């Protein structure tokens, strides 16, 4: 995504590597360039600014492109916000569904939530901080104010925060 973020880590480790930015706005062009280099025998590492590459992340499309062209993709397990959040949520972990980021289009978002109305598994959503309150209101409208939730942010970082409450309490928080 933003090469400056990865560059900090590479510089700290004193690694000199060529970086190619790959994000939502350049993925068609950058994806083809990266694929051409891989097909020519080069290797690369897919990293992301935060979280796990390809999980609610533009890297998902790059992995798909590689798979379509027979390029082997290997995962190196590491931190994953959704599993980390689930493990400390206090909610049932036996069965869950990951919904990623909801659509910014209000109608699409409401249709998606309506389709989940009867879902009994723990549901995991990602949301940007500046959209959280509106999303909590939409979730409350879809699932009712008594549904238990866990709000997790800055996981594994200095300012980690986990709040466990109902949707009604969260909307008023």
Go through each PLM region and give its residues.
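Short, hinge-like loop/turn segments at secondary-structure boundaries
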Residues: 15-17, 36-38, 63-64, 89-94, ...
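Short, well-ordered secondary-structure micro-motifs
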Residues: 32, 57, 85-87, 109-111, ...
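Class I SAM-dependent methyltransferase SAM-binding "motif I" and its flanking Rossmann-like core
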Residues: 61-119
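A contiguous loop/helix-start segment that scaffolds small-molecule binding in enzyme catalytic cores
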Residues: 43, 122, 126-173
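Generic beta-sheet signal
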Residues: 40-48, 96, 121-125
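Class I S-adenosyl-L-methionine
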Residues: 1-76, 84
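Short, acidic/turn-prone active-site loops that include or flank metal/cofactor-
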Residues: 3-4, 21-27, 79, 100-105, ...
